Amino acid sequence: MFSKILTKVIGSRNDRTLRKLRKIVDQINKLEPQFESLQDEELKAKTIEFRARLEQGEDLDSLLPEAFATVREASKRLYGMRHFDVQMIGGMVLNDSQIAEMRTGEGKTLTATLPCYLNALTGKGVHVVTVNDYLAKRDAETNRELFEFLGMTVGVNVPNMPPQEKKQAYLCDILYGTNNEFGFDYLRDNMAFRAEDRVQRERYFAVVDEVDSILIDEARTPLIISGPAEDSSELYIRINTLIPQLVKQDEEDSEEYRGEGHYTLDEKGKQTHLTENGQEFVEQLLKDAGLMEEDDTLYSPANISLLHHINAALRAHVLFEKDVDYIVKDDEVIIVDEHTGRTMPGRRWSEGLHQAVEAKEGVKIQNENQTLASITFQNFFRLYDKLSGMTGTADTEAFEFQSIYGLDTVVIPTNRPMARNDMGDLVYMTEAEKFAAIIEDIKGCSERGQPVLVGTVSIEKSELLSNALKKAKIKHNVLNAKFHEQEADIVANAGTASAVTIATNMAGRGTDIVLGGSWQADVAKLSDPTEEQIQAVKAKWKEAHDAVLASGGLHIIGTERHESRRIDNQLRGRAGRQGDAGSSRFYLSMEDALMRIFASDRVSGMMKKLGMEEGEAIEHPWVTKAIENAQRKVEGRNFDIRKQLLEYDDVANDQRKVVYELRDELMNVDDISEMIGYNRQEVLEGLFGQYIPPQSLEEMWDVEGLTIRLRADFDLDLPLQEWLDNDDKLHEDNLREKIIEAAVQVYKEKEESVGESVLRNFEKAVMLQTLDGLWKEHLAAMDHLRQGIHLRGYAQKNPKQEYKRESFELFEGLLDTLKFDVVSILSKVRVQQQEDVERMEEQRRLQAEEAARRQQLQHQNAENQLDDGEGAEEAHSPMVREERKVGRNEPCPCGSGKKYKQCHGKI
């Protein structure tokens, strides 16, 4: 109560921020007449002046009013577009490393030019991050003329660019590209063969467009570069033939019949588990197929690989659906992004799932992959000195932006008041009734000339609706992952009279739907148009625009509620841009996934009480509230998953930093002999301690064992026993020093024989090659640790703490092995001349090129990645037998110490 009164008196944090920024906008507006009077050359010269002032010690904040005024004036002269005051506020919010929530159509692309120009003055480079290549290229071309007029260079970062072109792009003042490409470039740079092969420079300032999509929706899935492991295609095919024989266990089955099912299905967690009966049944199938010995069991260590294949095949058959989760095109399984509805060619699910889906669809099976490098978006974007973002819908996720990224959200007011009519949800009993009502709504809009945008959650649903519209003889366009090549053209015409457009999820996001269509698109169709022709096109568009406004503006139809309220708001936000008229309504049914899994009991209870008849819909605030509560549950669960992914990746991130910094140091220095010397001493002291324990009696010394190891591992043929026999005063410390001195002397002789520069180059090559190989193996070991760590919860241990402890032990092992292997190789190898070093460098280069050719870029399946830790409310691992159901008042198996009902039982 008190906080509400306080907010009314002094305003919310958002209001106070806007009041402060409006004062700076007033300063910028006062500069406008002065900048209008400048000649073009004088305006261009401002960039040189600002850079000089920065070098003399001024900071960006003091330059901001003049820099923003410069960009506004240049935009007016080149594009005839003047930045609104609210866009100036948005630009300042971005410059302050915050998130600007700006409604659709408020000009986010133009707003971004302000902080981009200001921060590019430093010469450190600005990255504008978009959700797809099309938007990166479009925005770069849109703003290129403006930036180049002001003396800035503009680049585009897209996949498959030649390395030299990519390197040049990163040297540009302002670089547009996708989140995936920036992340993969970072990983590739840290796998580079030579320092000059790297393309990125330091990460300074990033403006993330559609920041909610990139930093939240895609944050559950890490970026992974992987390479092919062993070929097991035949096994995938043979296992695939067995899976259709398995029967799902129905949760409603009584205890008497429950044992008859072979697996349980968890739609929420996208997981399957074999029951005890299923385990026995699968074992028999494998024995009959000759894949397992008669007296063997599925869970014996020798059959871990079989279990992995069974689990992957089962998930492929019962959880992953064609035209929803993936499409089959040109004999290839292509993943469909669940957030954007776009296909992701070249991306593959991990853990053998992709191969299992390929076996299921009967297409060519590609080799399983091994992780070579990996990072989450959270940890990648936190590498930037300054990070900011803009979107139409961020306020619902403001807490997550603040807690994960340290970014505050500021809601920017619209330039004109919002005029869209958001109508209440209509809920039907069946999907068929829902689609019939949608068709009727579309017919009505089409007859009165009102354009309609229909949002669906999957390709399958968009094609189902498309077929229904064809039967009703209603002309329409489909915008989904299968047809995104025509995306810009379809979106450009989506606002024309009577246009009906079906869009999967958020396909087409980032492109405004203009009422009456796009006059620019019509002008682009003309070859070398005259000014008269352009004016004629504009006049024709104005008539069409006014007619569409009179019909009610763009009407949005949602065919299902998404898991996140934010994505529903994004769909609604396509209508009512810049104060235009518009409307929106969601049509739901009790058969929708969200309703079925999360909201069915409460809502269906309401509908039964009301005595619903076929074709009748319910529209009530209670129903809308129940649906929003279901969405909040899912949002909370997804936040937990993302937070958990980050907590686990933070452990790996600390290790990644150490390895990448070491690698960076190795590539940038010419002489690592001092490092090799320290390592040699440490390794020999460690080996000495194994055979001659500290402060021990001579009877406990294993001199013979030490002699053998020194000869075998370090090519040191030392008469240790003879030394001891001939010198009574030779004790433990003296002997250790004598061995180290002998090793140093032998290495010095090697250096003299081959030459100092040859050996320095060889040391560096050996160190890098060994580090890369061990890091790859370490990543595989970390993956395996992650997959089984959640089982520690059953032993009353905290999985997260166990993961930290064991991963630290693994990493210590990696560093110890690195030192030992490098010292051993350098001691044993016979380097004759520079050609030997060059041969090794060439071999390493060829291996690197071959690995690069065979690399797969993955955005790993999130649920598959997160089979662990406290966030895993189910027993995800196939190695666990079906456990009894956890009581609501019992301790949660995750190891948090809370009761189950207060922890994962809430979800």
UniProtKB/Swiss-Prot annotation:
Catalytic activity: ATP + H2O + cellular proteinSide 1 = ADP + phosphate + cellular proteinSide 2
Region (Disordered): 834-907
GO biological process: intracellular protein transmembrane transport; protein import; protein targeting; protein transport by the Sec complex
Biased composition (Basic and acidic residues): 836-853, 873-888
Residues where Zn(2+) binds: C892, C894, C903, H904
A molecular-function term among this protein's GO annotations: metal ion binding
UniProt keyword terms in alphabetical order: ATP-binding, Cell inner membrane, Cell membrane, Cytoplasm, Membrane, Metal-binding, Nucleotide-binding, Protein transport, Translocase, Translocation, Transport, Zinc
Principal EC category: translocase
Annotated GO CC locations: cell envelope Sec protein transport complex; cytosol; plasma membrane
One protein family per Pfam: SEC-C
Residues reported in the UniProt entry to bind ATP: Q87, G105, E106, G107, K108, T109, D512
Bilayer topology term: Peripheral membrane protein
Cofactor list: Zn(2+)
Family under the similarity heading: Belongs to the SecA family.
Subunit and interaction comment: Monomer and homodimer. Part of the essential Sec protein translocation apparatus which comprises SecA, SecYEG and auxiliary proteins SecDF-YajC and YidC.
Listed name of the protein: Protein translocase subunit SecA
Gene (name only): secA
